[in-house]
């Protein structure tokens, strides 16, 4: 799986869809719901369900980043699966506060 900036991916087991904002510094496996993500154009495989322990969900409009790999993705469609890299959950980035203007 080549995670290029702008490439679109979706979960194999839920409705989550993401766009890569920053690719990983080295080879990494992006997963959702306990399974590797698939290319946006591919059909979801039949009979798979979200793996136990990977049901925290993802929220549309949020950026998810992993400091270890440098990877950042933007969630474009909400789903029930947890976004992970190599089985390690990645968290949503906090929005930066804008400076006060007069």
Task: Describe the role of every protein-language-model region.
Residues 1-15:
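Long, hydrophobic N-terminal alpha-helical segment
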Residues 2-5, 57-60, 77-78:
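A short, compositionally biased
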Residues 100-102:
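Short acidic DE-rich linear segments
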């Amino acid at each position: 799986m080549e995670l290029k900036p702008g490439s679109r991916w979706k979960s194999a087991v839920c409705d989550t869809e993401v766009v890569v904002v920053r690719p990983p510094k080295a080879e990494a496996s992006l997963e959702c719901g306990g399974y590797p993500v698939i290319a946006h154009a591919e059909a979801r495989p039949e009979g798979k369900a979200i793996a136990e322990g990977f049901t925290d969900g993802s929220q549309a409009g949020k950026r998810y980043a992993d400091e270890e790999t440098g990877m950042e993705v933007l969630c474009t469609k909400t789903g029930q699966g947890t976004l992970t890299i190599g089985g390690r959950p990645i968290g949503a980035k906090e929005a930066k506060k804008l400076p006060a203007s007069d």
